Amino acid sequence: MDNLEKLKNWIAESRNIVFFGGAGVSTESGIPDFRSVDGLYSQKFDYPPETIISHSFYERRPEYFFRFYREKMLPLGFEPNITHKVLAKWEEEGKLSAVVTQNIDGLHQKAGSKRVYELHGSVLRNYCTRCGKFHSAEFVKESVSVPKCDCGGIVKPDVVLYEESLDQDIIENAVSAISRADLLIVAGTSLTVYPAAGLINYYRGNRLVLINRDETPYDGYANLVFHESLGKIFANL
């Protein structure tokens, strides 16, 4: 039996799938991956992207931060791909219990997924740092320079920047889901960014599946490994 057939059988038998995904899930919708060869980290800016999207840079140079953010990190107008759609279908069928994602684009919800734990936040949520009022991603996209609320406060995206902590409630929910899963599918992530990558250590089962174009540090621990595009695999599931 080849690996794809084995994965199909595991999915058929499973009642508690958890999907843990990274940037590679959304690249097939056209959203660039930070760390791929042609991703953000290899492009040329006055500062390294990890400096620009840090909390201290946001505080120190908000105009530059928002210029970069609007241009490079605000993925509007993109649509869910086959992976997002299949996951939403599994949830509807009662097979998938949660999606844990490192992405900030909201495409899982756009595809219909309900239980999504966004480790790094979402560009779709933006709050005034003074009064707490909610603002849309379009508001931030269309604002000139630093987006300001009616009250005069800066509108900050609900995205976890470098030097900021992950939301503890989301971490706890993700850990709980992963530890109870009967099948854990990890896809489109290099598994090198912590603490997010460490979450798969909470999996207790023996059906750990890794799908990623490149090798990851966890390949040796997985029960099934695919070095393929996600779309190619999910189109056959």
Language-model features, listed with the residues they occupy:
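Conserved catalytic core of sirtuin-type NAD+-dependent deacylases
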Residues: 1-237
